[in-house]
């Protein structure tokens, strides 16, 4: 049986990377929320 998590750096960047977050309004909201909170890393890759 194939496992559910098949890691790929490219897929991960495309779905949860900085540019993916900037592409949608909700993603930008998420980044601003993390900035307000004082996160050292905005994107947790």
Curated annotation (Swiss-Prot):
One Pfam family cited in the UniProt record for this chain: Ribosomal_L34
Single GO cellular component term: ribosome
Keyword line: Ribonucleoprotein, Ribosomal protein
GO biological process: translation
Keyword Ribosomal protein set for record: yes
Biased composition (Basic residues): 1-14, 31-45
Keyword Ribosomal protein (UniProt): yes
Region feature (Disordered): 1-45
Gene3D superfamilies: 1.10.287.3980
Molecular-function GO terms, alphabetical: structural constituent of ribosome
Family according to the record: Belongs to the bacterial ribosomal protein bL34 family.
Protein name from the UniProt record: Large ribosomal subunit protein bL34
Gene designation: rpmH
């Amino acid at each position: 049986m194939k496992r559910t998590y098949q890691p790929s750096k490219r897929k991960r960047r495309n779905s949860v990377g900085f540019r993916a977050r900037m592409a949608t309004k909700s993603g930008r909201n998420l980044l601003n929320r993390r900035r307000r909170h004082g996160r050292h890393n905005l994107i947790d890759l």
